[in-house]
């Protein structure tokens, strides 16, 4: 559901708005982890989330003119979905991670096939698009597998905090003229991205200075 909502969101609004919605994952995850896993969040992690919040607000004010209600709703749905995914990974650590990702991919395939069939669209694409689809599927699958492996050692809130690198990287990639998108980020997006980067660096330094995971009190 999270992946499907992400696709619908990014096709109905700008990449910046979609990624801003995903940047809210640490907040949803922290709340869900506290309610269902009883994971207490340390002060340092809350500081990182607060710094990231500043960046998100700055980026949001700079992208309001591009906002789409449908895209925003799907973006929030995707954010909540990925938060639930992160919490469930922590909830059942013994669950085979590769199996979880494989089942999720199969579910996405079935839904996509149904949508294509209902809209009477072709299952075939050009060689260029097919290559892009393959590259996309490989990278997303690899990312989810690594994300799942990391969930064994890192608390849920911290796991999604690290995933904020996707917000910075995503906005950068759609800006590159190489891919033909050339979606130029606004000044607010750049400044907000800097705050997100600072929050991640702060968290990384704290984790390096402390041998144990400080989020688990």
Predicted regions: what is each one?
Residues 19-22, 38-58, 65-72, 176-199:
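Loop-to-transmembrane alpha-helix entry segments
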Residues 1-17, 22, 56-58, 134, ...:
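Specific transmembrane alpha-helical segments of multi-pass solute transporters/efflux pumps
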Residues 29-30, 64-120, 133, 146, ...:
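Transmembrane alpha-helical segments that form core, pore/gating elements
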Residues 1-4, 26-31, 57, 80-83, ...:
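Hydrophobic/small/kink-forming positions within alpha-helical transmembrane segments
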Residues 1-4, 52-67, 107-129, 175-182, ...:
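Membrane-interface helix-cap regions at the ends of transmembrane helices
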Residues 9, 35-37, 41, 92, ...:
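Hydrophobic/aromatic residues within transmembrane alpha-helices
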Residues 61, 164-217:
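C-terminal-most transmembrane helix of multi-pass membrane proteins
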